[in-house]
């Protein structure tokens, strides 16, 4: 069953929101410019609202996709795709 949203965590020093935008542009569609709101960064990749929160949990950055319209069934599938493309440590 498809999840209503997806959230994964990427290891701190290994990736930034610009690398994430490049990956999401390929997977979901073109990313809008990132807008910083406090500690968070927001953009839209295709039709999917995206939130990037650096150091959300210790050394882990949160990537939150607010939609069920992604190519991934669940957090684990998204985490595997992120690992394959970005070559970074990922948790869900």
Give residue ranges: language-model regions:
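Short, extreme N-terminal segment that most often corresponds to the first beta-strand
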Residues: 1-25, 30
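Short, surface-exposed beta-edge/turn micro-motifs
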Residues: 4-7, 60, 87-88
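Generic structural hydrophobic/aromatic packing signal, biased to beta-strands
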Residues: 8, 24, 50-52, 63, ...
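Structural motif
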Residues: 10-14, 66-69, 82
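A common structural junction motif
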Residues: 25-32, 85-90
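Short, intrinsically disordered low-complexity segments
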Residues: 31-72
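Short, hydrophobic/π-rich interface segment
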Residues: 69-91
């Amino acid at each position: 069953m498809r999840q209503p949203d997806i959230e994964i965590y990427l290891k701190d020093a290994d990736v930034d929101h610009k690398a994430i935008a490049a990956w999401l542009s390929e997977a979901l569609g073109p990313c809008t410019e990132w807008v910083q709101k406090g500690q968070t960064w927001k953009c839209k990749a295709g039709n999917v609202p995206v939130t990037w929160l650096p150091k959300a949990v210790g050394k882990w950055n949160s990537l939150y996709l607010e939609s069920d319209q992604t190519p991934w069934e669940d957090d684990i599938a998204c985490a595997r795709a992120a690992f394959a493309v970005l070559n970074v440590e990922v948790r869900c």
